[in-house]
Design a protein with these regions (language model features):
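Alpha-helical substrate-recognition element adjacent to the catalytic core
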Residues: 1-83
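Mg2+-dependent phosphoryl-transfer enzymes with acidic/Ser/Thr/Gly-rich catalytic loops
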Residues: 29-33, 71, 76, 85-159
Length: 159
């Protein structure tokens, strides 16, 4: 399987990227989020074939995200992160990676520093304008609707 020659880590935002950004609240106050199965397939089946590890860095904390990350075998999960770039730099250092070894996908202003720092970046089609202008690749799909899977496909063939 052909792959991007340098990328070894894919870092993903959650709300608005792996999900549609909506938070559903039931009558009893329970929160729910929707994740797309195509994104999950790409993370579990395609990334390992490419030799790329998945990671999540998100500003919110949620048991739902913890559960989904476990299902997808994402071992690098960081929730409630205020300074995403500092966390990303620390992770890169721990893994012995440079910015050019890291791909990042996110949708909002709090992702911009990471987007600018990484070697390859992308966003869902419905990202905020500043992000749409800053990334290397804008997905045709929206957040929570297969954008991450599309970005993973791009990692397969991007020189």
């Amino acid at each position: 399987m052909k792959k991007h020659p340098k990328i070894r880590l894919l870092v993903m935002d959650v709300d608005g990227t792996l999900t549609d950004g909506c938070i559903y609240i039931g009558e009893e106050g329970e929160m729910m989020k929707a994740f797309h199965v195509q994104d999950g397939y790409g993370i579990v089946h395609i990334l390992p074939e490419l030799g790329i590890s998945p990671a999540i860095i998100t500003g919110r904390s949620s048991k739902i995200v913890e559960k989904r990350a476990g299902e997808l075998k994402i071992h690098h999960l960081y929730q409630g992160v205020g300074d995403k770039l500092s966390k990303l730099r620390k992770l890169a250092e721990e893994l012995g990676l440079n910015p050019e070894n890291i791909a990042y996908i996110g949708d909002d202003a709090n992702d911009l520093e990471c987007i600018r720092w990484c070697g390859f970046s992308g966003c869902p089609a419905d990202a905020v304008p500043e992000v749409l202008e800053a990334v290397h690749y804008v997905c045709r799909r929206e957040g929570g609707r297969g954008a991450v899977r599309e970005f993973i496909s791009r990692l397969q063939c991007n020189p």
